[in-house]
């Protein structure tokens, strides 16, 4: 067989394998009540901390409108009554969310409050990304919560869940899709803004490393080493090919993050890898994405489930139909 024939054969086998691999998974899985309950509890803690933060509510103007601030004046967010009201509504909505009642009202309201708080904060002339993923998750879960009611109004019939699946199955699946999709969008924006040269140009990140370290120092003035040492930037600049391999790996991790939807093991390893990526960014650039890391830990890594699986493996034989 000629070389060209071998290449064609390998290509066809690879394409066949890929299509077969894509046929399995990528659908909502069975999620038990206790599993989804723990996720709700953990995520609710993040929502409370986010909406109890007073920073967004100290602004009474929007000098650089962002997002919906172009359409609506949000300067009222700085009035004295707003933050206490948001706190009360947050507690009420979070309680409803945790007990699994009234989510079709609680989740959209939480999503609205999170959107308003993030918008007024990002309308001050600088963009913050630390809370974005919380808002996206709330919007996604709000849509899932409202969907059965929309279906009932539109088709005049109750939306019935497929056998063995619960609403938790859909909440988790579409939350994972939103979280993973946000990283795909990040990779796509890098690709488009660099005209496809992001990986090749990645050694120039050395300049961003120095910039972010200086900004971190001048923000708090408590760590002189951030100014005195630039070893990471020097190493990146002096080792361009290694830099392309390292940063290119992170780029493709983001680009293919939606593989997390295939099944639980893939979700776990994609989640762990993205957390490691954030840890590396924090170590090199002092950019903290704590909320994003915790969301990955809750919805992709899903530690309670794997602890349960480990306990089953140690305590007895694996059941024929695992409780997933």
What feature does the model see in each segment?
Residues 2-324:
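Alpha-helical membrane-anchoring segments
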């Amino acid at each position: 067989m000629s070389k060209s024939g071998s290449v064609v054969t390998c290509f066809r086998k690879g394409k066949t394998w890929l299509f077969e691999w894509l046929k399995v998974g990528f659908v909502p899985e069975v999620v038990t009540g206790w599993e989804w309950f723990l996720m709700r509890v953990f995520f609710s803690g993040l929502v409370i901390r986010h909406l109890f933060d007073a920073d967004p509510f100290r602004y009474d103007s929007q000098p650089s409108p962002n997002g919906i601030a172009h359409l609506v004046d949000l300067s009222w967010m700085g009035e004295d009554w707003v933050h206490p009201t948001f706190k009360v509504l947050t507690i009420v909505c979070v309680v409803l969310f945790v007990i699994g009642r009234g989510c079709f009202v609680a989740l959209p309201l939480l999503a609205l409050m999170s959107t308003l708080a993030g918008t007024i904060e990002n309308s001050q002339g600088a963009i913050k990304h630390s809370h974005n993923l919380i808002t996206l998750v709330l919007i996604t879960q709000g849509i899932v919560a409202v969907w059965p009611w929309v279906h009932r109004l539109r088709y005049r019939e109750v939306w019935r869940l497929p056998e063995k699946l619960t609403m938790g199955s859909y909440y988790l699946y579409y939350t994972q899709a939103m979280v993973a999709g946000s990283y795909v969008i990040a990779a796509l924006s890098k690709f488009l803004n660099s005209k496809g040269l992001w990986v090749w140009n990645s050694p120039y990140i050395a300049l961003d490393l120095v910039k972010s370290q200086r900004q971190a120092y001048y923000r708090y003035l408590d760590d002189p080493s951030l100014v005195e040492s630039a070893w990471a930037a020097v190493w990146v600049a002096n080792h361009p090919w290694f830099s392309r391999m390292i940063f290119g790996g992170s780029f493709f991790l983001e680009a293919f993050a939606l593989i997390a939807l295939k099944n639980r093991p893939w979700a776990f390893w994609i989640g762990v890898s993205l957390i490691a990526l954030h840890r590396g960014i924090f170590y090199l650039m002092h950019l903290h994405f704590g909320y994003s890391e915790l969301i990955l830990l809750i919805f992709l890594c899903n530690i309670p489930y794997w602890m349960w699986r480990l306990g089953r493996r140690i305590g007895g034989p694996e059941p024929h139909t695992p409780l997933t």
